């Protein structure tokens, strides 16, 4: 009986010894939270904490939570490593 296994190979990186190869994968948490901007140079995300229990917060706080937040310089550097295929 022939069994075929499908493997998702994205990219390979040599690590340490020559016979050790590690697959580069996208960080799934970052993939769900960050999207690439229209110009393709930065990332943006929504604010956390705007889903429920907002009755006692001010209208300016709720309006600020509806806006998009752009990644700063350090976050961009980390996101390039976490999201290698974007």
UniProtKB/Swiss-Prot annotation:
Please provide the record's keywords in A-Z order: Mitochondrion, Ribonucleoprotein, Ribosomal protein, Transit peptide
One cellular component (GO) term of this entry: mitochondrial large ribosomal subunit
Matching entries from PANTHER family are given as: 54S RIBOSOMAL PROTEIN BL35M, LARGE RIBOSOMAL SUBUNIT PROTEIN BL35M
The record's region (Disordered) falls at 45-69
What InterPro entries would the database entry show? Ribosomal_bL35, Ribosomal_bL35-like, Ribosomal_bL35_sf
What does the record give as the function of this protein? Component of the mitochondrial ribosome (mitoribosome), a dedicated translation machinery responsible for the synthesis of mitochondrial genome-encoded proteins, including at least some of the essential transmembrane subunits of the mitochondrial respiratory chain. The mitoribosomes are attached to the mitochondrial inner membrane and translation products are cotranslationally integrated into the membrane.
Gene Ontology biological process: mitochondrial translation
Tell me what this protein is called: Large ribosomal subunit protein bL35m
Presequence range in chain numbering: 1-18
Q: Which family does it belong to?
A: Belongs to the bacterial ribosomal protein bL35 family.
Per UniProt, subcellular location reads as: Mitochondrion
Keyword flag Cell membrane: no
Please name the source species: Schizosaccharomyces pombe (strain 972 / ATCC 24843)
Q: Which GO terms describe its molecular function?
A: structural constituent of ribosome
Spell out the subunit comment. Component of the mitochondrial large ribosomal subunit (mt-LSU). Mature yeast 74S mitochondrial ribosomes consist of a small (37S) and a large (54S) subunit. The 37S small subunit contains a 15S ribosomal RNA (15S mt-rRNA) and at least 32 different proteins. The 54S large subunit contains a 21S rRNA (21S mt-rRNA) and at least 45 different proteins.
């Amino acid at each position: 009986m022939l069994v075929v296994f499908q493997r998702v190979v994205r990219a390979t990186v040599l690590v340490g010894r020559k016979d050790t190869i590690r697959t580069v994968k996208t960080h799934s948490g970052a993939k769900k939270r960050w999207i690439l901007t229209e110009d393709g140079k930065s990332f943006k995300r929504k604010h956390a904490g705007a889903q429920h229990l907002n009755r006692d917060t001010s209208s300016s706080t709720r309006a600020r939570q509806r806006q998009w937040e752009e990644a700063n310089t350090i976050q961009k550097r980390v996101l390039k490593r976490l999201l290698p295929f974007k």
